[in-house]
């Protein structure tokens, strides 16, 4: 894959129902440690130590979810930056260890502030390397790869309803009405151990990466997401349109969307 420049954009919105935004996201150059500002559009070469695209969707009363998401995101970013080039040599192991460290960081926050007991967060961390993409996932935030006009899920929801759908007990169209639709099988910070699911794929010129909270995929269909990514070549505009789709669907939850376009050859057409 060429390395002419990576175009990345992130945006987060409280939605139309919730009072607080308990989502947190990070887009960070793991070589310099620099983080993009909210709603930023960043054109950069893929850093030699990788680029981190991270979404955490916190849960817990009295704004504790916001704290859990922030603590986890900062812990993961800091650990990966501190590891430096070791991340590129062992990306899966580095991501897994970073998520485990975030789990301990959130639990330490609860020890220091017992009133926050029960808080936790989802975590979907995508590590973009010059030739590959490595994703670690806990909970029901998601990562997708858009390639050749196809939206490919890179994560599986770690939730009760997802498990019921996979086992054939629940129809996909009935998920949104199920009383356990928000119950996760695991989250960062809620138990002594966490086991992130790790996925690694080779990247190609022109690939588009999407990382999002369930505030997007919970109310916007995969077909609508794919159509938006197909019809909107500009990364910043695609990011805004995906957030707008969630708001037009009622904005029932906080929504966070990160989109990155991999470098493509001058002669390559966008999928």
What residue ranges belong to the model's regions?
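PP2C/PPM-type serine/threonine phosphatase catalytic domain
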Residues: 1-271
